[in-house]
């Protein structure tokens, strides 16, 4: 992101750069070795790309989760630009999106995002990663605990584990079901981008779960639905007004 930590600090070592490129190209084949998406001359005319761009625009303009995250990014010195920081591309497998830390860019998988609700969740999820990238020096590629923490936060705060989504997945439960969902979704997200065993991914999630599950920034609470997200956005705006008057 503009002014993001990777642009303010010294760049990664050569070995880490190679690992970044390898991970990005495995999941996002349109990423070049330099970390930039390929742009064909007629790419903007493909139907899937047009739909992706329109859904993204609607999400950025109307979704309360995303509007709060955009304000929080700007407040932290990492203002988001639609054309610079989002890219609609075809992706491998069933991946819906990802945050490419090497370019501070969110990749939206136009071949796997098929409706507006899905776009809303993916953009929210990836913006949480971008927010973490902005506010802290996250070692995405060599520290599995850092990745696990951000995945726990994204699963917890993006609405991915909402009751509606879990019913749609035919997952039912009562006691601590939200926590179980967050653990499961975080583990799956790690496995989607790392060639490691499920046991290693689960262990990383377990090690960071308590502290990262209880880190609700910038929402200040778990936004279980859009109403909660609107309240959180209102409180975030009021918090800014309060501190500006001190």
Swiss-Prot record:
Q: How does this polypeptide assemble, per the annotation? A: Interacts with XRCC6.
**PANTHER family named among the record's database cross-references:** MITOCHONDRIAL INNER MEMBRANE PROTEASE, MITOCHONDRIAL INNER MEMBRANE PROTEASE ATP23 HOMOLOG
State any GO CC term.
Answer: mitochondrion
List, in alphabetical order, the GO biological process terms annotated in this UniProt record.
double-strand break repair via nonhomologous end joining; mitochondrial protein processing; mitochondrial proton-transporting ATP synthase complex assembly
Q: Which residues form the active site?
A: 126
Asked if Protease is a keyword of the record, the answer is yes
EC number(s) reported in the record? 3.4.24.-
Q: Which GO terms describe its molecular function?
A: DNA-dependent protein kinase activity; metal ion binding; metalloendopeptidase activity
The entry marks the following residues as binding a divalent metal cation, namely 125, 129
The main enzyme category here is hydrolase
What family is reported? Answer: Belongs to the peptidase M76 family.
Q: Which UniProt keywords apply?
A: Hydrolase, Metal-binding, Metalloprotease, Protease
InterPro entries, alphabetically?
Peptidase_M76_ATP23
The family database entries (PROSITE patterns) matched by this protein are listed as: ZINC_PROTEASE (PS00142)
> Per its record, how is this protein called by name?
Mitochondrial inner membrane protease ATP23 homolog
